[in-house]
């Protein structure tokens, strides 16, 4: 029994830094807080797109965790300067709470100029409004 507990502890100590490192190397993260409840918004789909010519190309998608975060949204490829957007698909989040919303999708466009920096896009959300900014 003691060996099993010790093995579990050692495995978690080895895995945690590796996961943190993977998220730490990723240049893009998002976070959603529900302003009406003051709590994170888990399970929200977020789509990352890159502007190409006259349209948008999907690069990645993910769902927020229990803390309302996606710590590593950038796909496993090199980042390039350019125009991008994240689309927060909030309609299902409010529908699951049996609430109406005026914004079923919230696209947030941003520009990446330096690929060696981290970009964090927080979303403060309510049924009829939202706010965002470049976080850290």
Swiss-Prot record:
Its main location: periplasm. It is found in: Periplasm. GO terms for cellular component: periplasmic space. Residues 1-22 form the signal peptide. SMART domains: TR_THY (SM00095). Changing residue 120 to A: Reduces activity by 90%. Substrate binds at residues 31, 69, 133. InterPro entries: Hydroxyisourate_hydrolase (IPR014306), Thyroxine_BS (IPR023418), Transthyretin/HIU_hydrolase (IPR000895), Transthyretin/HIU_hydrolase_d (IPR023416), Transthyretin/HIU_hydrolase_sf (IPR036817), Transthyretin_CS (IPR023419). Transmembrane segments: none annotated. Its EC number is 3.5.2.17. Pfam families: Transthyretin. It comes from the Bacteria. Changing residue 31 to A: Loss of activity. GO terms for molecular function: hydroxyisourate hydrolase activity. GO terms for biological process: purine nucleobase metabolic process. It catalyses: 5-hydroxyisourate + H2O = 5-hydroxy-2-oxo-4-ureido-2,5-dihydro-1H-imidazole-5-carboxylate + H(+). Keywords: Hydrolase, Periplasm, Purine metabolism, Signal. It is an enzyme of class 3 (hydrolase). Homotetramer. Despite its homology to transthyretins, is not able to bind to the thyroid hormones thyroxine (T4) and triiodothyronine (T3). Belongs to the transthyretin family. 5-hydroxyisourate hydrolase subfamily. Catalyzes the hydrolysis of 5-hydroxyisourate (HIU) to 2-oxo-4-hydroxy-4-carboxy-5-ureidoimidazoline (OHCU). This is 5-hydroxyisourate hydrolase. It comes from Salmonella dublin. The lineage of its organism: Bacteria, Pseudomonadati, Pseudomonadota, Gammaproteobacteria, Enterobacterales. The gene is hiuH.
């Amino acid at each position: 029994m003691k060996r099993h507990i010790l093995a579990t502890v050692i495995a978690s100590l080895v895995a945690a830094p590796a996961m943190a490192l993977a998220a730490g190397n990723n240049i893009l993260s998002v976070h959603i807080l529900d302003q009406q409840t003051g709590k994170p918004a888990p399970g929200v789909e977020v789509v990352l797109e890159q502007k190409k010519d006259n349209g948008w190309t999907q690069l990645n998608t993910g769902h927020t965790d229990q803390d309302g975060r996606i710590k590593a949204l950038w796909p496993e490829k090199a980042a390039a300067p350019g125009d991008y957007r994240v689309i927060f698909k909030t309609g299902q989040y409010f529908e699951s709470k049996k609430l109406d919303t005026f914004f079923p999708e919230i696209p947030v466009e941003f520009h990446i100029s330096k690929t060696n920096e981290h970009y964090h896009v927080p979303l403060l959300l309510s049924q009829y409004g939202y706010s965002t900014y470049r976080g850290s």
